């Protein structure tokens, strides 16, 4: 798919990886539909997209709420005319060990609220946005592409029961959708980033960063632009579907 002039929806598009992917795709002439909960960050990203050569529309919505997702995709089609691509990027963290004990006594447990908050956004939100994007593509007879942002944590990571479960789920959904939606000309895939040099990571202590990168064969963290490049590759390569691309510097080798 040539993304020039195509409408690409990005959830969590206000900052971080979402912003990087939006600006990168805008540089290829895409029309971005950015969904986030932070109006100020959305406006900043939209300005960067326009400066990069693309166009951008912004939408305030909680991806975990069905009625908001349905209404937002209706607005996107009304504003841009179509939905050609979706990057399911929105996500949150509520890290913590499932339980912590000392001398046979439980001191702390991961709460149901901490579990559910992550599942609602990182898994249910991906389902809702994927469903609505596919609905619009099929209704308009447009082929399209859905990309779910997973993580190397989908294989299981200490302190991330909720996050790992959600990221494994969105990878499985990408494979499932690739099988279900191919008949409509819709491709689906996932990206599993490793350690990426976002603003949050950059604020870590040098010794923590050194320890983090020591286990990566390429001996460095990835950049947000490298994840964005992977997304563009999936959009533009019409023979890619149902695959999870690990952009992780080899950490899972």
Regions found by a protein language model. Give the residues of each.
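Canonical Rossmann dinucleotide-binding motif of NAD(H)/NADP(H)-dependent dehydrogenases/reductases
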Residues: 3-32
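Catalytic loop of short-chain dehydrogenase/reductase
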Residues: 106-114, 147-169, 174-175, 179-183
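A short, exposed helix-loop element centered on a Lys and neighboring polar residues
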Residues: 130-131, 175
């Amino acid at each position: 798919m040539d993304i020039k002039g195509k409408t690409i929806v990005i959830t969590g598009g206000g900052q971080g990886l979402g912003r990087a992917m939006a600006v990168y795709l805008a540089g290829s002439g895409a029309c971005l539909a950015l969904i986030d909960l932070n109006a100020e960050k959305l406006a900043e990203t939209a300005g960067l997209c326009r400066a990069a050569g693309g166009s951008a529309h912004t939408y305030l919505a909680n991806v975990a709420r069905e009625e908001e997702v349905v209404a937002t995709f209706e607005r996107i089609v009304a504003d841009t005319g179509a939905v050609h691509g979706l990057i399911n990027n929105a996500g949150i963290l509520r890290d913590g060990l499932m339980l912590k004990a000392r001398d046979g006594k439980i001191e702390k447990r991961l709460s149901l609220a901490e579990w559910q908050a992550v599942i609602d956004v990182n898994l249910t939100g991906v389902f809702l946005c994927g469903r609505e994007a596919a609905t619009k593509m099929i209704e308009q007879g447009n082929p399209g592409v859905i990309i779910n942002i997973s993580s190397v944590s989908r294989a299981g990571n200490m302190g991330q029961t909720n996050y790992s479960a959600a990221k494994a789920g969105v990878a499985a959904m990408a494979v499932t959708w690739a099988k279900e939606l191919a008949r409509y000309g819709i491709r689906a895939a996932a990206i599993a980033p490793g350690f990426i040099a976002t603003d949050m990571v950059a604020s870590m202590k040098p010794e923590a960063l050194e320890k983090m990168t020591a286990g990566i064969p390429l001996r460095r963290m990835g950049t947000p632009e490298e994840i964005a490049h992977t997304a563009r590759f999936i959009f533009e390569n019409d023979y890619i579907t149902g695959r999870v691309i690990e952009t992780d510097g080899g950490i899972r080798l």
